[in-house]
Amino acid sequence: MEAAAAAPRRPQLLIVLVAAATLLPGAKALQCFCHLCTKDNFTCETDGLCFVSVTETTDKVIHNSMCIAEIDLIPRDRPFVCAPSSKTGAVTTTYCCNQDHCNKIELPTTGPFSEKQSAGLGPVELAAVIAGPVCFVCIALMLMVYICHNRTVIHHRVPNEEDPSLDRPFISEGTTLKDLIYDMTTSGSGSGLPLLVQRTIARTIVLQESIGKGRFGEVWRGKWRGEEVAVKIFSSREERSWFREAEIYQTVMLRHENILGFIAADNKDNGTWTQLWLVSDYHEHGSLFDYLNRYTVTVEGMIKLALSTASGLAHLHMEIVGTQGKPAIAHRDLKSKNILVKKNGTCCIADLGLAVRHDSATDTIDIAPNHRVGTKRYMAPEVLDDSINMKHFESFKRADIYAMGLVFWEIARRCSIGGIHEDYQLPYYDLVPSDPSVEEMRKVVCEQKLRPNIPNRWQSCEALRVMAKIMRECWYANGAARLTALRIKKTLSQLSQQEGIKM
């Protein structure tokens, strides 16, 4: 049986060499065995190949030996006549060669031939041959999806308790995040925790639940040694934003009660791709946008939200001169979604991925090579009409002030006096669509010089009157005429004292 299977394969392997040899110029005529050439001593001559075949039918075996002329070798590299064939009721095995009498051989046969053997594949067999590989591929794909899903579930699962074996020995048992931050701020560095400590914290955090998504990726609530933290997970295409935000957060002397507390930054391999983590303090109220959508605020609540926002921005904008000094920083994407509300009702500024720092010694601005732009709805007039001086750092600070004026308008609308308040709305909600273009905002803000409407009822409350006055002075078309963050902070501090509010 094995010899029979091998014989048909040998001519296929040698055909090219055989055909080439017979076509060489000057080659003599090839003598072959011919079973019909009785007059010529069973010999024939040819310029082509010697041929031998055996045909098996249901009742007999037919042998055939002869010469094949060169003209019949079609195609020349793999002649049809030399190929084995199978028809209903018969199977033919062939062999071609190019040496004298090389076809004087007996080709092996498979024995008695049955009709069933030659019939080829039936419909059931054909279906099985086709369905088999398809099922195998489907099962393989399902297995891959299952494995990937399990990896994700394992990575994001919520264990009953954290594995203490994951902690590294240099963070002693019982140490809290407050202890680590306190040690960092009193050690004199003021530029964030050591990288090894950051990595240790990040890699021993247990993710609990997803609490938000954005263009950068998503935010998770996590736990480290029982303390809740926020984990901002950037997608790999947002690596520049992750690196920039981590870099800004670790600026010397940046830590402030009204700026989101940075804990750690790390890149983690979750088994299928690399995640970029930024770990910070967790604030259960979420963003100011979410908070104002859910709740109205009292006069005291309004002042606390506004004053803490102004305090955070004033600290960002301020340059601290000294050995451990801090450069002035402009946010460039200030809005209610990038401000978080703390448990005590005050705010902290977050999302510093677009921030720029000013080096007063060289008067240069380190504008990050980042493809993102600020939020169009909150862009200042000079940003919308492209007249902003990108080489002048004060220009960026003034654009922040304009945006903060819009945030104050959002807060003041939710201030309830005598049960009266406005529904929450985004600035310019009545003038532009939900996702306005730069051109639509430029037409409203720069050409028509429109600003958010200030309700008449605000004039009946001193606190709302002060807030309205601050807003108008933040919205001037001329950036140089706008208030500074420090001036706004002082005005609101005086207002809080008048209202008897303790911050």
From Swiss-Prot:
Cross-link position per record: Glycyl lysine isopeptide (Lys-Gly) (interchain with G-Cter in ubiquitin)? K268
The record's annotation in Gene3D superfamilies points to:
CD59, Phosphorylase Kinase, domain 1, Transferase(Phosphotransferase) domain 1
Stretches in topological domain Extracellular: 30-126
Entry GO terms, CC: bicellular tight junction; caveola; cell surface; cilium; endosome; membrane; membrane raft; nucleoplasm
Any ranges marked Cytoplasmic in the topology annotation, and which? Answer: 148-503
Residues in GS domain copies: 175-204
According to the record, the segments passing through the membrane are: 127-147
Per the similarity annotation, which family is this? Belongs to the protein kinase superfamily. TKL Ser/Thr protein kinase family. TGFB receptor subfamily.
Q: What is this protein called?
A: TGF-beta receptor type-1
Which species is the source of this protein? Mus musculus (Mouse)
Name of encoding gene:
Tgfbr1
